[in-house]
């Protein structure tokens, strides 16, 4: 009985969406950022006004489950399933790879007629069939490994081809994502964009303006 009610409820939610115009969707993911790494959650050592605004004016999930490490969390986001079911059990030595037959959120949007793109960190496999271009993302600019040793103009890739990054990686990924959205404006095609930042993961490099802002700041507990 509960299953039937759940299905009816789901149908009532989905039916209006099917008839509505397809919205553009942007997902922004940060790396190794904890719940307490936001000023909106009481951290007085940081200043995160834009994220605070999203939390105050949008929807905030305050009771949720997420894996404490990288690749398992990414697998769960990409598939909507617990990471062991996807074949992901670690962050290296092949344990970061989702099963090749898993359907990703990008696959679903691509099938629905969306342009799909990922800019930034992947960490779910480096080669086909694990590469983002083989997992539903038509456009990929970034890196596939777990982290990068230098955040300034490093070696990256664009749709499988090696390229050199342009400046601070976070800014580079943001520019590329913005360019993608601007290109999509005149196409009449909706887009699904994942902007996957590698920060604040170590080595925790930042532009001088942000370093200088906090260089001599005392940490309060």
For each of these PLM feature ranges, what is it?
Residues 2, 17-221:
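Formylglycine-dependent sulfatase
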């Amino acid at each position: 009985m509960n299953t039937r009610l759940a299905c009816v409820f789901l149908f009532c939610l989905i039916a209006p969406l099917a008839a509505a115009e397809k919205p553009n969707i942007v997902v922004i993911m940060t790396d190794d950022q904890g719940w307490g790494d936001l000023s909106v959650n009481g951290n007085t050592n940081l200043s995160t006004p834009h994220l605070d605004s999203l939390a105050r004016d949008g929807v905030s999930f305050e009771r949720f489950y997420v894996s404490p490490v990288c690749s398992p969390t990414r697998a769960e986001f990409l598939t909507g399933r617990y990471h062991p079911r996807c074949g992901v059990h670690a962050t290296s030595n092949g344990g970061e790879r989702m099963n090749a037959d898993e359907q990703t959120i990008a696959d679903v949007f691509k099938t629905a007629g969306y342009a799909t793109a990922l800019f930034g960190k992947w960490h779910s496999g480096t080669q086909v069939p694990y590469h983002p271009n083989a997992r539903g993302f038509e456009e990929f600019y970034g890196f596939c490994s777990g982290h990068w040793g230098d955040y300034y103009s490093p070696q990256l890739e664009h749709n499988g081809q090696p390229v050199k990054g342009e400046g601070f990686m976070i800014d580079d990924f943001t520019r590329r994502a913005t360019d993608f959205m601007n290109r999509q404006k005149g196409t009449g095609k909706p887009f699904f964009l994942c902007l996957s930042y590698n920060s604040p993961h170590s080595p925790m490099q930042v532009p001088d303006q942000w370093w200088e802002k906090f260089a001599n700041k005392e940490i309060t507990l």
